[in-house]
Amino acid sequence: MADVYPVDPAFAADARITREQYATLYRESIEHPEQFWGKAAQRLDWFKQPTQIKDVSFALDDFHVRWFGDGELNASVNCLDRQLATRGDKTALLFEPDSPDSPSYPVTYRELYERVCKLGNALRNLGVKKGDRVTIYLPMIVDAAVAMLACARIGAVHSVVFGGFAANSIADRVIDCQSKLIITADEGLRGGKKIPLKANVDAALKIPGTNTVETVLVVRHTGGAVDMQAPRDRWFHDVVDGQPAECEPERMNAEDPLFILYTSGSTGKPKGVLHTTAGYLLFASYTHEVVFDLREDDIYWCTADVGWVTGHSYIVYGPLANGATAVMFEGVPNYPNVSRFWEVIDKHQVTIFYTAPTAIRALMREGEAPVKKTSRSSLRLLGSVGEPINPEAWRWYYEVVGDSRCPIVDTWWQTETGGILISPLAGAVDLKPGSATLPFFGVQPALVDAEGKILEGATEGNLVLLDSWPGQMRTVYGDHQRFIDTYFRTYPGSYFTGDGCRRDADGYYWITGRVDDVINVSGHRIGTAEVESALVSHPKVAEAAVVGFPHDVKGQGIYAYVTLIAGETPSEELHKELVSWVRKEIGPIASPDHLQWAPGLPKTRSGKIMRRILRKIAENAPDQLGDTSTLADPSVVDSLVNERLTR
């Protein structure tokens, strides 16, 4: 089996960036960042051209990150208005519904522009002003993109909440950003099942602290019956349809907020990652164009949900700013059958396909036949995102899905980074299965040891970034101190990613996974603290500890150790009740895969839970527990090892 897949000369001959260009541009981006990003800023349309390009300090006593600080622009103008002259009739979004029996349809740039303007006017009429926060809780439908761009047009800050989150998670996010308006739908559709979106919003708005919400706009999607409370609830079409199809865009400073997106942290509640207008939009569009080697006639499909950052950057902002055609898929990979992805590729003649290793591993289990019965001959480039892809899944993706003729861009980045930071460029970089390979322009990765010493050469350590890039998050909304403490205090002067990483002799980067208390489940980050606090909030639970363990399909699964209060006994019923309790508190993505009853948890004499030991037990590696002599009661470990569920 090949360990290196050299650049295909035929691909390279036509590629946007060649090997030589990559080396030259990367060097310029590191040695002369102002010059490099000043030129790159010309990708955007500005009301006022920036003269200040980079103003950055990671020093704890003078921390600031500003890019293009005196520039003025509007993100929706860059995604829509500037496309109208030459691409007005081009398809911007190609909607593919949950069921293949429902109609798919294209939305042109001109239609999208008009829909965005109408909603922008409606939001202004409802009192939404520049800087107000709007929560978007929608399925994967075109109106989700319309809602995001309409907020951007009038200078409102959108906070998109993934449609799989439950009422408590919605309420947490609404309360944290003091949202003024919510845009939702009657119901979502996913794999043939209905998701009660409006009912979830109703439940969320009964929770104390959510009373900043004045209006709920409801998209009629499935036509399902929902409870409408006047005057708070309004039908989306009633408010939007009569509006003018022109809407004056707000002039935004480069550093004005564009959106907040909540992501799991290693402690407590989710944090609101705040991205600003110019740097984010520039970085999303630039990475999208270069990493995916974009052409004017590409049909590009990213299978993510807009509720995650991948959907923000690589379905909405990046592709539309580039005038691309993006597929928007409401469904799931295995409904109504496990050929669905490949059937959609053939139906729409998709040329670039970007999905998560979890989906690849799940479909790989179904064998080659469901793939081979489709053509996929339109494909020219494949991408992977969300978590490290194991070499076996990489090879299957390359050989079976891409017929050994499509390069794979294995992209590493985070909600916090706004866009792709480490990835091969298909015309410039040889591929290695499982490696994210080399950094994008302007990105300076380094590996450090536990003390923060920079490690040279082929080695393994914690991944940090030595300098800023335009797509970098600017703060945790409403909690700047948490931002500094989380990302910049561990290794002063650097941004700490929270990921471990190996660098090989060729300088290629191999992401090894989180080194903090965050689990990467199917490419979605789940904080162990969130799941623990959900479990402990159940009246019968005294204590809980949650760790990740290797999972064949999801990458990592959730393993929970639960200690019940005195007088309660474990049962199959209580097991089911606790799993559904977590689903209700957070959402289905946080459901524990294993829940082990624990008479006690391994603690130090000072009362700290030794998660390292729990991790090894969950990984079925009881011979690697290390020193347990510091535990208050070492016998606890023996009983946990004997009862472990992953043997």
From Swiss-Prot:
Post-translational changes noted in the entry: Acetylated. Deacetylation by the SIR2-homolog deacetylase activates the enzyme.
UniProtKB keywords: Acetylation, ATP-binding, Ligase, Magnesium, Metal-binding, Nucleotide-binding
Example GO BP: acetyl-CoA biosynthetic process from acetate
Binding locations of Mg(2+): V536, H538, V541
Cofactor(s) recorded in Swiss-Prot or TrEMBL: Mg(2+)
Post-translational modification N6-acetyllysine, affected residues: K608
Residues the record lists as binding ATP: G386, E387, P388, D410, T411, W412, W413, Q414, T415, D499, R514, R525
Acetylation keyword on record: yes
Protein origin, superkingdom: Bacteria
GO cellular component, one term: cytosol
Binding annotation for CoA: R190, G191, G192, K193, T310, N334, S522, R583
Catalysed reactions, as listed in the record: acetate + ATP + CoA = acetyl-CoA + AMP + diphosphate
SUPFAM superfamilies: Acetyl-CoA synthetase-like (SSF56801)
Known role: Catalyzes the conversion of acetate into acetyl-CoA (AcCoA), an essential intermediate at the junction of anabolic and catabolic pathways. AcsA undergoes a two-step reaction. In the first half reaction, AcsA combines acetate with ATP to form acetyl-adenylate (AcAMP) intermediate. In the second half reaction, it can then transfer the acetyl group from AcAMP to the sulfhydryl group of CoA, forming the product AcCoA.
Protein name: Acetyl-coenzyme A synthetase
Species of origin: Xanthomonas campestris pv. campestris (strain ATCC 33913 / DSM 3586 / NCPPB 528 / LMG 568 / P 25)
Gene that this polypeptide is encoded by: acsA
